[in-house]
């Protein structure tokens, strides 16, 4: 078996699923008693979530509702980078949350280092926003997938193009 096998390690957030989770969270907020009369809102602007609420406590509750809905839709919550809470107009507070899509250089280096430290006979290289892993043996590639799932990475990773 001279042919090499490969797969890609990527980190993606499905925006339609995020939009569905936002809509479900807004629907729940509209019906919850503790949010009656409050100015709470969640919006998706390109690849950024904007959470607005009356105070910090309600903002945290808003985040909890959103995270619950994201988890139900299988959206990785590790890929959400919450910014600082800022005071907005009308006595409300706002928080922006950036959706991280793609593997940046630092995380790619961590992934490559983990693979090299494991001693598995595969090669890994960083391409654009993904890491390609190649090896002669498919069992080695599956071992790398298992290693990545166990690793405590700051982002959620998926595995695609297993050939």
From Swiss-Prot:
Example GO molecular function: nucleotide binding
Highest rank taxon of the organism: Bacteria
Keyword Nucleotide-binding: yes
Keyword tags: Nucleotide-binding
Function: Nucleotide-binding protein.
Protein family: Belongs to the YajQ family.
NCBIfam families in UniProt: PRK05412.1 (NF003819)
Protein name: Nucleotide-binding protein BPUM_1028
Organism: Bacillus pumilus (strain SAFR-032)
């Amino acid at each position: 078996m001279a042919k090499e096998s490969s797969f890609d390690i990527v980190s993606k957030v499905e925006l339609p699923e995020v939009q569905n989770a936002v809509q479900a969270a807004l629907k729940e907020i509209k019906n919850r008693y503790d949010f009656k009369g409050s100015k709470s809102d969640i919006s998706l602007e390109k690849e950024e979530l904007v959470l607005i609420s009356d105070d910090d406590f309600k903002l945290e509750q808003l985040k909890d509702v959103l995270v619950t809905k994201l988890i139900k839709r299988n959206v990785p919550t590790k890929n959400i980078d919450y910014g600082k809470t800022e005071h907005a107009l009308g006595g409300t507070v706002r928080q922006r949350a950036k959706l991280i899509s793609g593997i940046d250089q630092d995380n790619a280096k961590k992934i490559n280092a983990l693979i090299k430290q494991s001693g598995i006979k595969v090669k890994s290289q960083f391409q654009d926003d993904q890491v390609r892993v190649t090896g002669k043996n498919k069992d080695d590639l599956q071992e790398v997938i298992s290693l990545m799932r166990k690793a405590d990475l700051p982002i959620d990773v998926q595995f695609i193009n297993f050939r």
